[in-house]
Amino acid sequence: MKSTGIKKQENGYEFYTPHYPPPVVVECQKDLSQYGIKGRYLDMTFSKLKQLGAPPEDKDAYNCALKYAVHLNEHIKSGKGLIMMGPVGTGKTSLAISILRRAIEQGYNGYLISMMSLLDTLLVLSKGPAEHYLKFENRIRNCPLLVLDDFGAEYDNKWVSSKVDSIISDRVERGKATIITTNLSVQKIKKCYDSRIYDRLKETSFILSFKGKSKRDPLDISQI
């Protein structure tokens, strides 16, 4: 049987050393669902945002969000978040997810969840084993970057208000960065929750206002 190795001679002996093909490096994509990114947002990145463009009247807000992403590492370390306010369809969630993707790429354990899902999950888990509830709530309270999508869309009751207040206050005190998207105005947020919730967020967040129309212009992401 003919050897496929490399023939060598040493001390009067002939032998073959194995010949292995060069290693093939396969890049494994992270399972984004573990960070709360699912469905139509799985391919959402800053490159995708560039293709989609931005409404002309929201260029300043988009540029501020891009600037936040450029300095993401320092913002996460200092607990500085973002509040993105405006009508449905202005790209707030897409921006938030693109920033979260950047954080994941930098090694941070971020998480995205809608407010409805957050509170539904807490309610369901509260009726089961305590360790499951505590594990989930611990992640919400302690992950370096939490994205709360559609803030204010959840049902209104005292338990919800107190739980939201508790989570946000805890994250502010721990110096954890939070990104919030909401269709509500400042006045409506203060009406839905204790005004202290918004005040706490305002102290530790950049606030961006979106106006939004369907027409979109090219988006410059060269700084990213």
Language model segments and positions:
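Short glycine-rich substrate-engagement loop in P-loop NTPases that contacts/grips substrate
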Residues: 58-63, 104-142
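Pre-Walker A adenine-sensing motif
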Residues: 63-76
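Loop/turn-to-beta-strand initiation segments
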Residues: 108-109, 142-145, 174-180
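A short, basic N-terminal segment
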Residues: 1-60, 67, 207-208, 212, ...
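Walker A/P-loop nucleotide-binding motif
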Residues: 77-96
